Amino acid sequence: MILVTTFQLFLIIFIVTYLSVNMIYLIRIYPVKEELVAYPYISVCVPARNEERDVKKCVESLLNQDYPNFEVIVVDDNSNDNTPKIVSSMAEQYSNLIFIAGAQLASGWTGKPYALHQAYQRSRGQYLLFTDADLTYQSHALKTAVHTMVCKDLDLLTLMPAVIFGSFWERVVQPVIFGFIASLTNFRKVNSESHQSAMGFGAFLFFKKEAYQKIGGHLSVANEVLEDIMIAKKAKLNGLSVLVADGKSLFSIRMYHSMREIWMGWRKNIFLAMKSSVFRASYYMAMVLCFLLTPYIVVMCNLWVGAESVWVGISLLGLALTLATGLGLCHELGLERKNVFLFPLGAILMVMIMISSMLQTLLLRRTEWRGRIYEQ
């Protein structure tokens, strides 16, 4: 147990140090209240497939922006629920809301890129915001985004939303996965013009139109499941100015409402985020378990075998560092402190989802999402 306890502590110190330094480089976007010098025309492009639960609230929040010069284009991606009925009814009431009944999915495309490509074809804006139908926007979001783009002379702004956790399973699994994604994103590198590392969040991809056209738009990522990350990579490879930032003050999301939705939603792409590498996925699964689960096990084992007090103390120090980091994550995500004790279970479930995603990708050679199957 001495070697295990020592290794465990050094591993925890390494992870805590990396996460702490990484967060220093996280840029946060805050609301802009003053008037802008100019209000360039914005086209907000929203793909919607079976989004009857959320689409009305999302579109209403977009239409209620304190920005005077924009349009909202919603493309129904062949939904089999009431999504098209809801949006088309709203479009009759708002002149700046355009509803498009999307074409059947074309060969060589995945659903979301194809829907956004159709929205782009109808767009008139100097700026293009590609977003999702399950978001809720604050009224200052567009004004703040334009202000940020202009002041920082950006070609692409991509933002992370605030996250809403409803059910028990959301509070168990989602914080662990969001923390995991944040740990994969080296904020210093992705915001460095001299480094090729890139990150994109499909919930908020805000382009200058000419920059979007320069990289070939969504046509250039037509068959990608992780189209948001890939289009951000293309932007950086083409020398565009890209900013990845925290946009919690601008918009929020409740991604999934049940364990089944969480499982199916992350299974489709979490292994792809590992670049389909078994080694990479195994490494990160081990790191997640060693950080969030094994500190409890090491403490209990040291107490069980009657280890010397110094080793019990070292194992407790490791657990304390893990808990402190977990409390920081709870604060960042707006969760109650007691939620930190759910993270070990969340780590186990995240690993199970990763393994399921791995098997689906490597053995079945396919990805499934919203009733569609994409062959790998």
Task: Enumerate the language-model features and the residues they cover.
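Membrane-embedded multi-pass helical conduit in multi-pass membrane proteins
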Residues: 283-364
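Acidic donor-binding segment of Leloir-type glycosyltransferases
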Residues: 59-105
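Cell-envelope/extracellular polymer assembly enzymes that use nucleotide-activated donors
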Residues: 40-43, 71
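Acidic donor-binding/catalytic loop of UDP-sugar-dependent glycosyltransferases
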Residues: 82, 131-148
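N-terminal membrane-anchoring/stem segments of glycan-assembly enzymes
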Residues: 1-38, 175, 350
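Catalytic donor/gating beta->alpha subdomain of glycosyltransferases that bind UDP-sugars
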Residues: 149, 156-181, 210-213, 218-281, ...
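Long helical/loop segments within the catalytic core of UDP-sugar-dependent glycosyltransferases
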Residues: 98-118, 144, 148-206, 210-214, ...
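Short, well-formed alpha-helical segments that are part of the catalytic scaffolds
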Residues: 25-32, 51-64
